[in-house]
From Swiss-Prot:
Self-association and partners: Homodimer.
Any Pfam family the entry gives: TPR_16
Organism expressing this protein natively: Salmonella typhimurium (strain LT2 / SGSC1412 / ATCC 700720)
InterPro entries, per the entry: Lipoprotein_NlpI, TPR-like_helical_dom_sf, TPR_rpt, Ycf3
Annotated localization: Cell membrane
Claim: Repeat is one of the keywords in the record: yes
Membrane-traversing stretches: none
Gene expressing this chain: nlpI
TPR repeats: 62-95, 96-129, 234-267
Function (record text): May be involved in cell division. May play a role in bacterial septation or regulation of cell wall degradation during cell division.
Name the record gives this protein: Lipoprotein NlpI
Record membrane topology: Lipid-anchor
Lineage, broadest ranks: Bacteria, Pseudomonadati, Pseudomonadota, Gammaproteobacteria, Enterobacterales
Gene Ontology CC terms: plasma membrane
Signal peptide, first to last residue: 1-18
Top-level taxonomic group: Bacteria
């Protein structure tokens, strides 16, 4: 190719790439990242005052530490949450909800064997604690134990077939086992559902029934305020990231996982595992390493 023609080709390619990136940014739906509320700050201050009091029984102290840990977790303060959960467990080692949170943190840190043990403890203490099946299933999924993950996530799905996110996680696992059968099973679950929750729109996208543009238009139309918009975006961007990851489009997947995290919906499963996905993609997660790998 002659130098002049080569230059024209490169210039045209750069121009088209710039237009494509610009169009992507203009069409992107964004929310204001969630921030701590005054009510949450007041509750934390009040909890601190009560915990400083000596007029608490052991059971009361353990419960309050757990509740403060949950609040810390919802604000993204995982190191403080883990500290409260550990203190609660030292006082009362029979709290399944505490083992559940610790198992989630261990999964996020990639410490899967310890996570399995934590979720096993949850179900030993309370066999009806169904979310342990979700969280253990996710840990097994990331740990590469796909058949066991399918068993847990199928049990979780069967408890509420109208919850779209149960179908989505089950599909992500079954996709690794047999992609064609997984798609057929997802379609069957979609058709049997009441389709009332927002997440079924994501399922429709996965099935190829709607485009990504239609999905995002429905998202904007469904959101009633900034909080619901941020929550829907955290969910949708995570599952879009998983979709593009399955296609081998690592750049789009990485961008979408970052967008899922950017909304600060810290207590959503999609936010938690978008961080893990970024870690697996080689993105630096210094806070994750420092707080969880102990």
């Amino acid at each position: 190719m002659k130098p002049f023609l080569r230059w024209c080709f490169v210039a045209t390619a750069l121009t088209l790439a710039g237009c494509s990136n610009s169009a992507w940014r203009k069409s992107e739906v964004l929310a204001v990242p969630l921030q701590p509320t005054l009510q949450q700050e007041v509750i934390l201050a009040r909890m601190e005052q009560i915990l400083a009091s000596r007029a608490l029984t052991d059971d009361e102290r353990a419960q309050l530490l757990y509740e403060r840990g949950v609040l810390y977790d919802s604000l993204g303060l995982r190191a403080l949450a883990r500290n409260d959960f550990s203190q609660a467990l030292a006082i009362r080692p029979d709290m399944p909800e505490v083992f559940n949170y610790l198992g989630i943190y261990l999964t996020q840190a990639g410490n899967f064997d310890a996570a399995y043990e934590a979720f096993d403890s949850v179900l030993e203490l309370d066999p009806t604690y169904n979310y342990a099946h979700l969280n253990r299933g996710i840990a097994l999924y990331y740990g590469g134990r796909d058949k066991l993950a399918q068993d847990d996530l199928l049990a979780f799905y069967q408890d509420d077939p109208n919850d779209p996110y149960r179908s989505l996680w089950l599909y992500l696992v079954e996709q690794k086992l047999n992609e064609k059968q997984a798609k057929e099973a997802l379609k069957a679950r979609f058709e049997k559902s009441d389709k009332e929750q927002w997440g079924w729109n994501i399922v429709e996208f996965y099935l190829g029934d709607i485009s990504e543009a239609t999905l995002m238009e429905r998202l904007k139309a469904d959101a009633t305020d900034n909080t619901s918009l941020a929550e829907h975006l955290s969910e949708t961007n995570f599952y879009l990231g998983k979709y593009y990851l399955s296609l081998g489009d690592l750049d789009s997947a990485t961008a979408l996982f970052k967008l899922a995290v950017a909304n600060n919906v810290h207590n959503f499963v999609e936010h938690r595992y978008a961080l893990l996905e970024l870690s697996l993609l080689g993105q630096d997660q210094d806070d994750l390493a420092e707080s969880d790998q102990q």
